[in-house]
């Protein structure tokens, strides 16, 4: 009898995505006839704008069906570089851009070429759940820098300064934030820059995937534009999923110092190779095209974010710092005495509401609800949440 195959240590340590698991469970229950209301989605519920779909279809029909450069189509890399230069205030050339299979692969590639055993990643908490897993897959250790609503879910400069050690290699910044909706202002970034100037061995990766999704009165600032003197150790990860409603297209990008981006491109050439060729022409149309569709979707999210936030603030025992961007709310529900996983299980089983436990994001006091749903679905979800909490 053959010996059983043994998984590698890194595979055994890997945790599957809880958000995807919850979404799959909700779909399964719905297919079984259960009345399920899901506020767990991390993707826009809009269709990709027609002009983007048309451009991809035209590229397909015109023969863009072969292998392309591993780093991405040259026109798309140049268009992304131009966008970063003109819109974000970060001077970028096309050889500093790598087109990836979504923002997640951009992070994976970067971590694999930059991190290794003995390296430390500084991660503000709450955090997007894939950050620690991706860092650990690269052999690095993760040091959490916790925050909460009383601090606005913001990384404090003095907290960062105290956390940095000789082993610290990379700081992760995510603004607007998943899951909290926090937006780092210019003053926040300037204070972080002051600290990093004292620690030249620490690089920064800025996840800007929600840059277009901002509540009124808030602005997005690219860290490399605020602190251009640090640009030689700042990486930007972004993509088309959230702003252009292109989650299934799987097109993101990594931008930053040439040598590291080149290494990430070499890694990609030995793994997935190029992103789907004709899909890149849809992305090219998106980044070069008018922003009307992006603005219209962002406005819809503003209305839904307000609806969700105001509804949560009326429920007894629920504490919420109103989100400033992205399309999530992250209320504290610890007054009910249940850990977040237990509460989310009861919500799904008893009232058919699918949301994500805060423990997945590093804060067991909270749950994450998405406003990437119709207003009617948001109202339905709020009613189910209030009904379940009232029964506890």
Q: Predicted segment positions?
A:
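PLP-dependent class I/II
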Residues: 1-7, 11-17, 22, 29-36, ...
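A glycine-/small-polar-enriched, mobile loop at the entrance of the PLP active site in fold-type I
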Residues: 40-43, 58-77
């Amino acid at each position: 009898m053959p010996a059983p195959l043994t998984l590698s240590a890194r595979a055994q340590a890997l945790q599957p995505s809880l958000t995807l698991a919850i979404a799959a469970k909700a779909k399964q229950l719905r297919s079984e006839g259960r009345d399920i209301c899901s506020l767990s989605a991390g993707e826009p519920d809009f269709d990709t704008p027609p002009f983007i779909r048309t451009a991809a279809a035209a590229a397909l029909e015109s023969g863009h069906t072969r292998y392309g450069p591993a780093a991405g189509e040259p026109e798309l890399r140049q268009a992304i570089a131009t966008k970063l230069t003109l819109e974000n205030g970060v001077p970028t050339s096309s050889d500093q851009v790598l087109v990836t299979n979504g923002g997640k692969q951009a992070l994976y590639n970067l971590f694999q070429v930059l991190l290794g055993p003995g390296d430390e990643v500084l991660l503000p908490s709450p955090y997007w759940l894939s950050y620690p897993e991706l860092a650990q897959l690269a052999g690095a250790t993760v040091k959490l820098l916790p925050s909460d609503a009383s601090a606005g879910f913001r990384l404090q400069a003095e907290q960062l300064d105290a956390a940095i050690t000789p082993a610290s290699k990379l700081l992760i910044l995510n603004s607007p934030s998943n899951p909290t909706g926090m937006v780092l202002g210019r003053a926040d970034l300037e204070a972080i820059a002051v600290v990093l100037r004292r620690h030249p061995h620490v690089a920064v990766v800025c996840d800007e995937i929600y840059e277009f999704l901002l509540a009124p009165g808030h602005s997005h600032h690219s860290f490399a534009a605020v602190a251009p003197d640090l640009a030689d150790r700042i990486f930007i990860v972004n993509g088309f999923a959230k702003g252009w409603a292109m989650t299934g297209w799987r097109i993101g990008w990594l931008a930053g110092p040439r040598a590291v981006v080149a290494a990430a491109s070499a890694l990609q050439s030995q793994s997935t190779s190029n992103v789907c060729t004709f899909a890149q022409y849809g992305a090219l149309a998106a980044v070069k095209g008018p922003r009307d569709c992006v603005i219209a979707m962002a406005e819809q999210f503003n209305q839904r974010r307000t609806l969700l936030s105001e509804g949560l603030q009326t429920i007894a025992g629920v504490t919420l710092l109103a989100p400033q961007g992205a399309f999530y709310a992250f209320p504290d529900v610890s007054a009910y005495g249940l850990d977040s996983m237990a509460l989310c299980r009861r919500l799904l089983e008893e009232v058919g509401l699918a949301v994500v436990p805060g423990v997945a994001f590093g804060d067991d006091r909270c749950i994450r609800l998405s406003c990437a749903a119709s207003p009617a679905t948001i109202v339905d979800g709020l009613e189910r949440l209030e009904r379940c909490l009232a029964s506890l």
